[in-house]
Amino acid sequence: MSLRRIMVTAVRNLHPVTLLPSPRINILYGANGSGKTSVLEAVHLLGLARSFRSTRLNPVIQYEQAACTVFGEVQLTEGGTSNLGVSRERQGEFTIRIDGQNARQAQLAELLPLQLINPDSFRLLEGAPKIRRQFLDWGVFHVEPRFLPAWQRLQKALRQRNSWLRHGTLDPASQAAWDRELCLRSAEIDEYRRNYIKALKPVFERTLSELVELDGLTLSYYRGWDKDRELQEVLASSLLRDQQMGHTQAGPQRADLRLRLAGNNAADILSRGQQKLVGMRIIAQGHLVSQARRGHCIYLVDDLPSELDDQHRRALCRLLEELRCQVFITCVDHELLREGWQTETPVALFHVEQGRITQTHDHRE
């Protein structure tokens, strides 16, 4: 799976452009502030209908423009193509289209799986549990088709219970029914996550060993409540506290991934450079998605040279190359990446200057 064509209109400072990227390696280079990251942001918008730089989409829309639009032609793994389009108006209207039909965000994400590697990747270690849950659930979503409907039912049950905790609006029978639904969906989500982590751990360890030597680094999964107790029991025993807090404290919404080194929190021991390398391990998820979907992720790698020394930069390039996936990489000096690829790997170069994009090397040549 890869993007054959990308059309970008009114995204930040970018001039309207049509890109014909390589199915493998694409390097966007230029001075800081030229618009390189905005290209990655446009691809991210196309695949996830949201920006990785801002929780609000209005700043993404170019100044004095009414809307921004990104269109993509996707080469499907099984053959054929699919056309995707995402448009956001300044007044708030959001349109997602797949092959001419209105679509939902989840359909978009399923069709175009993206992985982002940027200077914030190390936040997987030192950031809040929510960041690690999002990382975990991205992978589960792409390998387990039953996950999304189960997660949606869980969220509905959780909203009902939290509303009752705050306002006491449910009768005892309704409260018991929603608690049962919450427990059933929690067990289902927990099973999908555990199965995924079981498959991820050996891939994670192998991938990490190719980037950095960290003997004894372990990855474990906390499901969000005591592993030796049923959730129903935990909910009953914590009911008074939940009512005082106004929300449910135990359950899958409190799950976390834990990285430990020599029995300690890895974020407390590892240097910032080591944390960045461990953060790069998200490549491991691409292996699992490729196996489950018989297709490939698309990787967005922002400012790679500044984050790694030459040795680890080459190691990361080698891992990305071995995945045989499509990659978009930004950098200031493309010469730092010129020697990172095999001669048979098709590499396209794009120079970005003040929002204008010029292809300086065509992968087809």
From Swiss-Prot:
Query: Mind naming one GO cellular-component term on file for this protein?
Result: cytoplasm
Under the heading Pfam families, the entry gives:
SMC_N
Where it mainly occurs, coarsely classed, is cytoplasm
The cross-references to InterPro entries, in alphabetical order and at most eight, read:
DNA-binding_RecF, DNA-binding_RecF_CS, P-loop_NTPase, RecF/RecN/SMC_N, RecF_2
Q: Where in the cell is it found?
A: Cytoplasm
Annotated residues for binding of ATP: 30-37
GO BP: any one term: double-strand break repair
Q: Does the keyword tRNA-binding apply?
A: no
Hey, which family's this protein in? Belongs to the RecF family.
Summarizing the function annotation, the protein's role is: The RecF protein is involved in DNA metabolism; it is required for DNA replication and normal SOS inducibility. RecF binds preferentially to single-stranded, linear DNA. It also seems to bind ATP.
Q: What is this protein called?
A: DNA replication and repair protein RecF
Q: Which organism is it from?
A: Pseudomonas putida
Query: Which classification does the entry list for the species?
Result: Bacteria, Pseudomonadati, Pseudomonadota, Gammaproteobacteria, Pseudomonadales
* Gene name, Swiss-Prot/TrEMBL: recF
